[in-house]
Design a protein with these regions (language model features):
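Cys/His-rich Zn2+-binding cysteine-cluster or related metal-binding knuckle/ribbon modules and their
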Residues: 2-8, 17, 27-91
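Conserved phosphate/pyrophosphate-binding and hydrolysis machinery centered on Walker-type P-loop NTPases
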Residues: 19, 38, 51, 117, ...
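Conserved beta-strand -> loop -> alpha-helix junction used to position metal-binding or nucleic-acid-contacting
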Residues: 166-176
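Conserved small/polar residues in nucleotide/adenosyl-binding loops
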Residues: 181-183
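Extended interfacial segments that mediate partner engagement and assembly in macromolecular machines
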Residues: 26, 74-143
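Short Gly/Thr/Asp-enriched flexible loops that form oxyanion-binding sites at enzyme active sites
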Residues: 148-161
Length: 183
């Protein structure tokens, strides 16, 4: 039997919006939280409130920053290349692999052929400004292999293409050793 307490139902509904969580998983999490109110709900609520109040998206690079501090993109100019990703999770994956040393630029999504970057609030104008301001030599476009990711990559490539900037994209295709019969 489901709970009739509206606050719990609403909490389950809100948790169900998170990626990878359905109503059943959300219920399990809520029950765990309720059974450990002092040790879990209070610190979680405090942390969420702090993030809501203090963390914002940098208008220049799309990374997260504290509202009262300058972003890392403003302070570190020792690199001459930039890696363009769709979202923060993509940047974290590349960063954790420790395979790239340079600037990051988080677009905030992708676009399809029916819309432009301004409609999607993508940070493409600020990317162009950063390339010029920091005299960057290479732009690595690390968008996904989806239609939207490739549409975005082509748009960026067409927008910034010139003789002085090397444009690189992530490798795509068949994994080494995979036979066509397995596709």
């Amino acid at each position: 039997m489901d709970n009739d307490i509206p606050e719990i139902k609403e909490l389950i509904r809100q948790f169900s919006k998170l990626p990878g969580l359905g109503p059943k998983s959300a219920k399990r999490i809520i029950l765990k939280l309720i059974n450990n109110k002092e040790n879990m709900i209070k610190p979680l609520a405090k942390s969420l409130a702090q993030v809501y109040k203090k963390v914002v998206r940098c208008e220049d690079c799309g990374n997260l920053k504290l509202i009262d501090r300058i972003c890392i993109c403003s302070s570190d100019n020792s690199y001459d290349k930039i890696c363009v990703v769709e979202n923060l999770a993509d940047m974290w994956v590349i960063e954790s692999a420790n395979i790239f040393k340079g600037h990051y630029h988080i677009l905030g999504g992708t676009m399809n052929s029916n819309e432009n970057y301004e409609q999607k609030n993508l940070l493409i104008k600020s990317l162009i400004k950063r390339i010029k301001k920091n005299n960057l030599k290479e732009v690595i476009i690390a968008t996904s292999a989806t239609v939207e990711g490739q549409t975005t990559a082509h748009y960026i490539e067409d927008t910034i293409k010139n003789d002085k900037i090397k444009i690189t994209k992530l490798a795509q295709g068949l994994p080494v050793g995979l036979s066509l019969i397995h596709i």
